[in-house]
Every structure is written in structure tokens, then in C-alpha cells.
Amino acid sequence: MLHSPPPFADGLRPLKVIIIGGGIAGLSLANAFEKAPVPIEYVILEARDTIAPQVGAGIALAPSGCRILDQLGVYDDLEQLVHPVQSSGVCDGQGKSLLPERSDTALLVTARMSYPLGWVERRSVLQVLFKHICHKKSVLTSKRMDRIEHSREQEKPIKVICTDGSFYEGDLVVGADGVHSKTRSEMWRVVEQNICDDFDVQQERRAMMAEYQCMFGISSPIPGLDAGMTDDTLARDVSMVVASGKDGKIFWFLFKRMPQVYHSHEIPRFDSADALKFAEQYFDFPVQSGASNIKFSDLWERRETATLVPLEEADFAHWTAGRIVCLGDSAHKMTPHTGTGGMLALEHAAVLANIICRLVAQGNKLPLTTSQIGTALSQYDEKRRHRRTSAKIKSTGASARMQTLQSLADRLVVRFLLPYAGDIRADQFCDDAIGAEHIEYMPVPARSMTGLMPFNPNRGIGMHESIWPRVLWALPLLGMAVAGLLTMFSVAPFEDAYDFLARRRYREVEIRDKFYHSGLLDDFSRSGVLRFIVSEAHFFYQPFSFFADYGVWYGIMLVESARRANRLNVLSFALLWGMLNMWGIAIFVPIYYFAYYILTPISTFDASDRRLTNLSYTKTILPVLLATHYATFMDAYLSPVRSHRQAAGFLWELFPVWLSLAQAGLARKFLQPSTLKQDRLNNVTRDLPTIRTTILGLCAVSTAVWQYTVWCSEDSLVNIFIPILSSAQGQTFEQLFAEFLKWDQVFFAIPNLFWIILLFADLRAAGLIHAGWLKISFSALGLIIAGGNGTMLGLMWLYREEVLATRRDRGAVVRPIA
């Protein structure tokens, strides 16, 4: 019988839905229908004789699905059955750990998304979902579908006929009957008979393939596998995932790559004899690294259930046709490596409920036509949703292949990058979850809006910003780098400089030949020493102001190098950027900005903890920068003893090296243990006071030098800072050297401003700020007038930092501000 909702005062005609399959997707959809604000009748036809059979499978509950379960009012019951994952380990086929220590990355997922990762029996999820259904008589077991009758007549209902001869009529059929979906086959038949829609059915039939087989099971507790632990074992062509749930119950999956890739009807099936033979091959396969010495044989001996299946993968291009719609594994199938499949089925059940609710709310009094239903269902079968689903299928497939070390790249990543990957697995889980769907006609749970990474339908897997528009926007920075290179080196008096260095004398000043007593280091540094000698004698103010501004940039670069979001990219290599700039600030600062803009779109900071920096290093920035950059720079210009000036010049030329060594020493000796691991979970703004002090301190120095230049120089600012655009012919060595440094500063200052424009454009696009470009421009101009280019750079960047720490993207689902 169909569940009939109570009559609605507005006389809306109820929509009749036949759900094939009483699994997680089908039961969730039924729960959503019962809570709809419009009349929706439904019946669930389940082929098995019980609604919650023991098939020996565990399911990972992840935030994307938990929010929907919370909306349905079932999550509290499920949470009692779950022990949240608290620690994770990864080892190789010999039992050697691939991580420096067990990871708490699952706790970070909880802190970000407000729902923990946890494992539970699939049967328990079904039992809880069924428990919350009010009209249980609408859930029928032992009802195996035989066929679907879909009429060409627009207003005729669709009919489902079961193998026992019973039949059911409704407005549409939802196929939630799994990977071997009879509904999907019937939908293809209807299309082939030209009853509705038109797409390439043969291509759809070829979409399914299987490259892996999986033995999954449940075992009773084993000492050493405590509740809340997960362990992965990675080896060539075989891998294993083991998770310990409530009361120590163990859920496990043993994956193996099959000899070939099978397609569609070629995909093999396995029986109990195959399962036993398969298991015996891997009795010695390690489960966990360390002294526990737990092997697969221990799981096998304590098994409660064990099943061997092929792992189908399919990305079907069409989920609907006429009055038929596929849901869950019947529409898309992926490997279980990331626990995505079940959660995606919940999401799509929510989407389908939203669409059907809107369809009924339109107030149709007459029976809905096939065209009307098809038009509504096209919102479900849309490009955006396919893109996100396809991305998840590819992601889980890539995970399966990496865990079995399928390619050379996979083996290199596991061997060399995985130990340093930090929270990359949390990033992957959260990227899967952040863009999750929800039930639109039910309140969003308050719990889901309190995490460090709010849900956002515009973010996440399948919704990532394309890199190419960012490349195009940032291309002018590369143009500036090239222009700086060509312009500076067109005026640089290299021959005269080499001559002075070779003679070890500039005019009447002797140039020190050795300082480090290393030919490589001394030769590298002497040219810079010449810069200080020449500029101090002939054009003091411009380089003095320039290198004060450069200190602000260097401080920002050091903060960015300590940022969690930049842990695995080139921005973390502060020493590299520092030494490159010694070959030309105007060349490599724009390149740094280009890399930064490409690598850190605004979505990088959707999780507040990714903005966080390692405070052990951030605390050292101001003192070590003052000691290694500013002190040596000031001494090289202002010391009354000429020999001290040259010594300071030698030291300054390698200040990035001394700075890096000082940072490492201070961080390890005086600022340990690092609080980063705790801060990322519960104190993500802990570094802000230190960052403020650092940048404001550097800006104060830059402003003081700028004001000193403005008020103490007898020359005009134009003559001090603006290079001559005419030919360099006929100019003296000193004049050419001055022009060289002026161009160096010009092609440092312009990229600074352009980078700030790009960063603020990101803030505006995300709705993080609402100021217009006129206000932003006048703010930047005012800062330049008051404190110079370096102060503008530092304070505008610091404002952005405050915004990133305290505001949310316009699409974020958060509690409204009272």
C-alpha cells in the first residue's frame, strides 16, 4: 500500500512515488517524504524478506551524509552506535609504518565539519532509518520487481509489476536497488523502445567496469585494535583498510587488483569457496605497524561475516528517463576506499526529495504528465551534479590505485610524500563534504554550522575554481618580471663593476677580498658589498628606503612559509625565495606573487585552520629579521667604521641563510613543543597577535625610513625614486648604478600593488569584504603617501589576514549574525 499523507487544506494533489529498494537511499528518501510540507505518497518495494539483512558490511558515516541524517532526526540514534575515529595508521606490506606517528586527522575532520568520522554496521543504519518511518506499512518486503510498464501516453501513470504478480501504480519510479539495478535496466529498455527520452543505451551499458575485488567483513574485538582506530596497509596490487568501531567491533576490507579489467557482463562473481581461497593467500598480511604484530589471519579467525565481491566502477551519463529515476549505486558506482558511495546516495536522496517537493508545491490539480515529471527530474540529472559525482568517482578510483601502488607515481608519492603529507587526508574528506546537498524544506541543524569549515554548496570536489582564469589574471606579474629583467640589465654597469671587483678597489675605497674564506661565498657577496659602498656615497635614500620596504615583503613571505595551507607547495621554501631575490628582487618577487595567486585561491582558506601558521616559527620572524636583515643593512649604511660597513655588507648578502638558521635554532631550542597540533583543532586564531606585532613592527620601520627620506632628503622624491627613461649612454658608473637600483624598486613596488589588487579581488568575489574599488584604491594610496610602498603592502596584507580569520564566504552555511 502507498503511504497516504494527511489531507492538505490547499487541496494540493499528492504525488505518488514507487521506491524500488529498501536500502539506505530508499529509506532515507521515504523519511524525507514523510517530513515534506506537501502531500507525497510512497511505497517501498524491497526484494529481500527483511528490511535490514546481515550482509556483513560496515559503512563509514561522514559529515556530508550525517548532516542529512541529522535533518531527518535519525542521527542522534546512530551516534550512539558509533565510536568516532580518533587515530589512524598506515603501514606497508612488511608492516613498517609509513607515517612518523599515528595521525589524529579524523579529529580535524570533526573540528571542521562538526560531525565525526565513524564506522557502523550497514544493518544498524537500515534499522534506525526504518525505526523512524511513521508509516511502516508502506515498506513492503519480498517484493522483487519483474518489470516496469511505462506508457507513451503523457498522462498515464507508471506501473511496477512484481514477480509475485502484484503491481503498483504511481507518478514516478525511483530505482534505489543497487549496483545491479533492475530499475536501470528497465529504464534503458524504455529508452530503446523510444517510449521516452533518447540517449545511447549501449554506451551506458559499457560504462561499468571492475579492476579490483574486495573481501569485506566484520570481526570481534582484537587486543591492540582499540575502538576508534583505523589502519591502512598499502602494498603492490593489494591493500587493506581496518577500522575498529563501537565496543571494539572490527570492520575490514581487503582489496586486490584482478588480473584484468572486466567490463559490464564480463565482471566475475565469487562464492564462498572463492572467498576462502582468496583469504588464505593473505593470512600473513600485516594489519598494523609496531609491536602488535596483528595480521589478517587474526581478523579471519575472529570473523563474524566475510564476503568476496568485485568492485564495480561506473559513471553513468543519464540517471533519468521519463518517469524513471535512478538513485545511489544504481546511478553511479565507486570503490569504497573513501567511504563516499553511501554518503553520496544520501545527498542525492535529499536532492530528489527537494525536487519532488517543489513539483508538488506548484499546485497541479490534474495528473502530472510525463513531460512535466521529466522536466522536473532534469534538475536532478543536471551537469553540475554529474560533475561533482564524476569527480568523486575519479577520486575514489585514484585512491584505490594509489593504495595498491599501481603506478610509479603512486609508489613515489607513498614512499616520499605521504610521511610529510600532514592533514592531506582530512583535506580530502572535507573537500568531499563541504559542497554536500541538504534537504531544503527542513531546518539546517545548528550543529552543522559551528565547525571550522562550514558547508558551502559552491565549494568542494567538482566545484573547484579553474586554474586557467587565475593564470590569465596573474600573467601581468610574469610580464613585470621579464620587464624588470630586461630593463635593469639594460642599464646595469656590469663591466665597470667587474673591473672594480677585480681590482679590489672602488675609487679610493678598498674592497675586501675575503670574508667567508670561501671562494663561492665571497664571490657571491662582494658584488653586494660594492652596492653598499657606491650607494652610501652617491644615492643613499633610495636604496635605504627600498630595503626597508623589502623587509616588510620578507616578513610576509616568512609568515606564508609557516602557513598550514602552504605546507606542501613551493611557498613554504622561504630560503629558496630569499636567495633567488639576491639575484634580483624585481625579477623574483613578481614570480613569487604569480605562484602565490595560482596556488592559493580564496577557497584554500574555507577551513579556518588552514590559515593558521606554525607559531614556533611565526614568533621568530620579527627578532630574526631585525637581527639578520635590518641590523646588517643599517650597519652597512650607517656604521662610522668603514670596515664594519663592508663586513655588514657581506653578512647581509647571505642574510636569508642566517635568518633560516636562526629561525630553526630558536624554534627548536626555545619554542618547543609546538602548539600547532592543538591549535588547529581548538585555537585557530592563536597566531594572530604575533602576526599583528610582526607586520606592524616591520611597517613601523618602513614608515620611519620613508618619513626620514621625505623630510631629510634635499632632493625631490621624483629624482630619488623615478628612473630616467632616456638612453643610458653617456652616464657615469654611479648614475647607471643608481638607475639600476631605481628600476629594481619600481619593479618591486608595482607588483606589490598588483598583488594586493588580486588578493582584494578574491575577497570581494567571495563576499568577505564589500568595499568598492574606489575605497580600496584611496586606502592604498593613503598608506603609500603616509608610509611608503612597504607600509601599504604590509597593512593591506594584514587586513586581509584579519578578514580570513574572522569572516566566511558568502556561500557558507553559517548561523546568521544577530
From Swiss-Prot:
It is found in: Membrane. This is FAD-dependent monooxygenase anuJ. Belongs to the paxM FAD-dependent monooxygenase family. Disruption phenotype: Does not affect the annullatin D biosynthesis pathway. It comes from Penicillium roqueforti (strain FM164). The gene is anuJ. Keywords: FAD, Flavoprotein, Glycoprotein, Membrane, Oxidoreductase, Transmembrane, Transmembrane helix. FAD binds at E46, A60, R122, D329, G342. One of its GO terms (molecular function) is FAD binding.
